[in-house]
């Protein structure tokens, strides 16, 4: 039993972080979002951005404690699971929807996401449980983030989902809405 701060301070091995970022690139290629063979500068930039985002565990490890992988956890049960709901930010599409909050990525949530992915890969899609009494009323991005800690990436890919934008596209229902700007002008937007 440990606090969320103690859990976040447990370091991950560089190999695990690299494997996580390579998996993110592979997922993007599989979904047709990235062409590694094109040789285009834009695709190389996109690949690097995907790798960097996936490799960022969000926390700096300062203590001299064993690596997460060496602790041989077979399960992680996190109370107050809603504390880990900002592990991914909305992409270009979902970020433009009216009334959809797009909070900054939480370092602690990002760390949990990488550790949860490691646990599920090691335990055949199992091993992570999130407990919360906080309802998912904020946004579909919150739902995606929380579900991503307990659903393996392979399962998401079967549904055609690798990003929060995909989740909104598959499960969200949008319509044209009127939004009033600060200037008083009204514009139509997807929301």
Where are these regions (language model features)?
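SF2 helicase catalytic motif II
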Residues: 7, 16-118
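Conserved P-loop NTPase motor "coupling/switch" region that bridges the ATPase
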Residues: 28, 75, 91-191
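Residues immediately flanking
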Residues: 4, 80, 133
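Inter-Walker segment of RecA-like/P-loop motor cores
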Residues: 1-11
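Activation segment
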Residues: 10-11, 85, 139
